[in-house]
């Protein structure tokens, strides 16, 4: 998950699969609020 978050922080494009993984992790509550706030 960390590489996907780093892409997000750098405003880089993500693949559809990466976006799905990120969204699923958010929905399941697997990310800390501090990770989402950046």
From Swiss-Prot:
Database matches in InterPro entries = Glycosyl_Trfase_fam3_N_dom, Glycosyl_Trfase_fam3_N_dom_sf
User: What EC number(s) does this enzyme carry?
Assistant: 2.4.2.18
Pfam families noted in UniProt = Glycos_trans_3N (PF02885)
User: Which GO molecular function terms does the record list?
Assistant: anthranilate phosphoribosyltransferase activity; metal ion binding
Q: List the disulfide bonds.
A: none
* Reactions accelerated catalytically: N-(5-phospho-beta-D-ribosyl)anthranilate + diphosphate = 5-phospho-alpha-D-ribose 1-diphosphate + anthranilate
Give the record's keywords alphabetically: Amino-acid biosynthesis, Aromatic amino acid biosynthesis, Glycosyltransferase, Magnesium, Metal-binding, Transferase, Tryptophan biosynthesis
Where in this chain does the entry annotate a coiled-coil region? none
One GO BP on record is: L-tryptophan biosynthetic process
Pathway noted in the entry = Amino-acid biosynthesis; L-tryptophan biosynthesis; L-tryptophan from chorismate: step 2/5
Q: Which Gene3D superfamilies does its entry note?
A: Transferase, Pyrimidine Nucleoside Phosphorylase, Chain C
* Self-association and partners: Homodimer.
Q: Provide the family line.
A: Belongs to the anthranilate phosphoribosyltransferase family.
Q: What does this protein do?
A: Catalyzes the transfer of the phosphoribosyl group of 5-phosphorylribose-1-pyrophosphate (PRPP) to anthranilate to yield N-(5'-phosphoribosyl)-anthranilate (PRA).
Q: Per its record, how is this protein called by name?
A: Anthranilate phosphoribosyltransferase
Q: What is the lineage of its organism?
A: Bacteria, Pseudomonadati, Pseudomonadota, Gammaproteobacteria, Enterobacterales
What's the gene?
Answer: trpD
């Amino acid at each position: 998950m960390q590489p996907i978050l780093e892409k997000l922080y750098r405003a880089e494009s993500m693949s559809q699969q990466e976006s799905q993984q990120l969204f699923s992790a958010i929905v399941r509550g697997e990310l800390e609020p501090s990770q989402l706030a950046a």
